[in-house]
């Protein structure tokens, strides 16, 4: 089954998405997501200029060989642009292979390891009262795992805080330059345990409670944070400190038993090898769109399973519904599954990407359609052209550039 075309689409039905469509001489097509938030055009260019021309004529069934060709053949490898492109190709080829087998992808991977995929949602607010209202709404929808973020008194902007009441959190801003935000670690460390106390006092311990620190703390500050929230039994604290300094997680481990999740910015198994091998984390956050597709994620998950590290894949709506569909198939199969992030998508987005997944009482299922179970409406997508948007940058209150 030969590949006869590979096309790249950049569309913005509310957010910018990069979609790869591979077509074979049998008529079967496959879809892949190559979205890299704020850097969509470089990935699209890499696909168009370097990847798509080299796909033509290749056997679509040779997924592993094609993966190795674009990984080893790149020479300048493992970067986010290269790996996002490889991920999209890999996703599309698995979509084709599962369609050729006339089975949903999770069956081709080895079958279901569970009846549904537990997903966690996002709650947000400018105050604790707003967060409690938002939490109640998501709990009533059936979510069993809920991420909690809140505005911090004395700070105009805080990671995870929606720009208006009732709005979903959207970090990227339209325009030609990134937004600059101010950050105070002391204000954050003083306030955030009070947020978790309020949530547990009102709702108890029935739901899993998650929190994202988004690389903002130093190792000793992260240790202090983890110790301060142990009574509230967080499911995890995410990205407490920049993961480039992987040895520092040993220090955090020595001070707290709050579970740690890391890895949404990782692009390969090499990025997380030390953290997993030394059991410095509990959940690996790599995502199918950035870590080498289904093939790359299988390697990471298999390695992590040796050390009882579970998956907790990054999955906000800055990755397209194609990634979400692929993630749900992967999550349903992978033995060492932990939880899957799910922010939901707007009606506009789902019109461009019709899907077959379902949500019921806190769990999702990818559906039984052959392949990924998702489609792409090219004509509708063309009505939503690329719209430049950038993730913010952060500074301390004295103006020092900090980790966003």
UniProtKB/Swiss-Prot annotation:
Organism expressing this protein natively: Pectobacterium carotovorum subsp. carotovorum (strain PC1)
SMART domains per UniProt: MR_MLE
GO biological process: amino acid catabolic process; carbohydrate catabolic process
MF terms (GO), sorted A to Z: magnesium ion binding; mannonate dehydratase activity
Task of the protein: Has low D-mannonate dehydratase activity (in vitro), suggesting that this is not a physiological substrate and that it has no significant role in D-mannonate degradation in vivo. Has no detectable activity with a panel of 70 other acid sugars (in vitro).
Important for activity and substrate specificity, annotated site positions: 316
Catalytic reactions on record: D-mannonate = 2-dehydro-3-deoxy-D-gluconate + H2O
Protein name: D-galactonate dehydratase family member PC1_0802
